[in-house]
UniProtKB/Swiss-Prot annotation:
It comes from the Bacteria. This is D-methionine-binding lipoprotein MetQ. The keyword Amino-acid biosynthesis does not apply. The MetNIQ system is also to be able to transport the toxic methionine analog alpha-methyl-methionine. Pfam families: Lipoprotein_9. Belongs to the NlpA lipoprotein family. Residues 1-22 form the signal peptide. Keywords: Amino-acid transport, Cell membrane, Lipoprotein, Membrane, Palmitate, Signal, Transport. A lipid is attached at C23 (S-diacylglycerol cysteine).
Length: 271
């Protein structure tokens, strides 16, 4: 029994050391990187960056797709991926505050303006008293949406709320609108809900059903928005060669042209 235990222990130690060696080698490999992106239009843009990275920098980019805004940072923090490209700074800051992530921005990508869409009305003048307005429920995009609703005159928020107001900060609501908070991926489908008159949707999700801010939005966020998307990695990985190469590939003319094509002119260069 003692012999068997020693044998198993030795084998276990060997397997463990090989696994760790493999992980270390992969992390330090300047020619390979795993990047998290949101499935859909942003994935299409990232695929162009993937091609540029290979052709110009000899970097193999493995894209890992996600369907929501929470998992990409969780996966990055755990080391399952090396970087992600999907979020703006206010969202990243909130995630770091709430979850204690050691994440950092290493480059800017695009501003994807949010806009108000509807299948029930064509202008805000048609919005009836007591109408339901759907907005994203994550803190940063909720705040972003409420600030936009304020800018177009539908509501008024308390002074000094910054970038993260909530529905509780609404002090004036002339049309008695009912703010309905939904998961961001559900917002495009909410347009078919008979109860929802208007939905504020991020370009990433609006594009999945063929909507673009300039063409289909009843109102659109300004292009000088502070919500530029970022390429993010872990603090201990920010100087890695594979990360630097990916940032260079993403911030290329080819990717900019692809983003404008995919989003029908709805992508604003952020670098």
């Amino acid at each position: 029994m003692a012999f068997k235990f020693k044998t198993f222990a030795a084998v276990g130690a060997l397997i463990g050391s090989l696994a760790l060696a493999g992980c270390g080698q992969d992390e330090k490999d300047p020619n390979h990187i795993k990047v998290g992106v949101i499935v859909g239009a942003e994935q299409q843009v990232a695929e162009v960056a993937q091609k540029v990275a290979k052709e110009k920098y000899g970097l193999d980019v493995e894209l890992v797709t996600f369907n929501d805004y929470v998992l990409p940072n969780e996966a990055l923090s755990k080391g399952d991926i090396d970087a992600n490209a999907f979020q703006h700074k206010p969202y990243l800051d909130q995630q770091i505050k709430d979850r204690g992530y050691k994440l950092v921005s290493v480059g800017k990508t695009f501003v994807y303006p949010i806009a108000g869409y509807s299948k029930k009305i064509k202008s805000l003048d048609e919005l009836k008293d007591g109408s339901q307005v759907a907005v994203p429920n994550d803190p940063t995009n909720l705040g972003r949406s409420l600030l936009l609703l304020q800018k177009v005159g539908l509501i008024k928020l308390k002074d000094g709320v910054g970038l993260l107001p909530t529905s509780l900060d609404i002090v004036e609501n002339p049309k008695n609108l009912k703010i309905v908070e939904l998961e961001a991926p559900q917002l495009p489908r909410s347009l078919d809900d008979a109860q929802i008159a208007l939905a504020v949707i991020n370009t990433t999700y609006a594009s999945q059903i063929g909507l673009t801010p300039a063409k289909d939005g009843i109102f659109v966020e300004d292009k000088d928005s502070p919500y530029v998307n970022l390429i993010v990695t872990r603090e201990d990985n920010k100087d890695a060669e594979n990360v630097k190469k990916f940032v260079q590939a993403y911030q290329s003319d080819e990717v900019y042209e692809a983003a404008n094509k995919v989003f029908n002119g709805g992508a604003v260069k952020g670098w």
